[in-house]
Amino acid sequence: MESTIKNGISHAKKAALLSIIPGIGQLYNRQKIKGCLFLGLSILYVFVFADLFNMGFWGLFTLGTEVPRDNSIFLLAEGLVALIVLSFGLFFYYLNLRDAYKNGEMIDQHLRVNSIKESYHALLAEGYPYLLSSPAFILLVFSVIFPILFSIALAFTNYDLYHSAPANLADWVGLETFKQIFTVDIWRSTFINVFG
């Protein structure tokens, strides 16, 4: 064990630290093809989704600034899509860190690290159910979870007839809409009649 742990830092920890940039930890673990794949996918992810993140998060926080150019509802939807895509990217980033650390542990224990072909066969053998159900999960996220998130987020805006595109923009109002259910007489009586 002394040969693999120098200066108190194990190979696994070094690989995990190097994996802050995806793929570098795999390259450090002598998994060149996997490292290049992770690095390439990460670079593609950043370039492909850079505009979505830029406009999406700007739109999610501001809901637009200029009439009639901005549509608050479209910006809200784009921002939620950016959040979902970011969560998928963070999950990939976690898998990258975990993979580098686990393979670094194998090197610390003087075990042989799997080649790309062996990793592929292990993925098919152990992760086949996840691999097969992942397209359905992605479809589920965008067809079920996204509309629910959109409806919840819309409830915290002042979107109504008087705050709709292209003439006006919606704004974030927090819990003000929910407060009005109990303070506006007609809304309160309707709410009480439905639940009372």
Question: What does each model-identified segment do?
Answer:
Residues 44-61:
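Juxtamembrane "helix exit" motif at the C-terminal ends of alpha-helical transmembrane segments
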Residues 54, 58, 104-111, 156-163:
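Transmembrane helix-loop junctions in multipass membrane proteins, especially transporters and channels
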Residues 60-66, 100, 143-185:
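Short membrane-interfacial helix/loop motifs at transmembrane-helix boundaries
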Residues 88-93, 183-196:
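Transmembrane alpha-helix signature in integral membrane proteins
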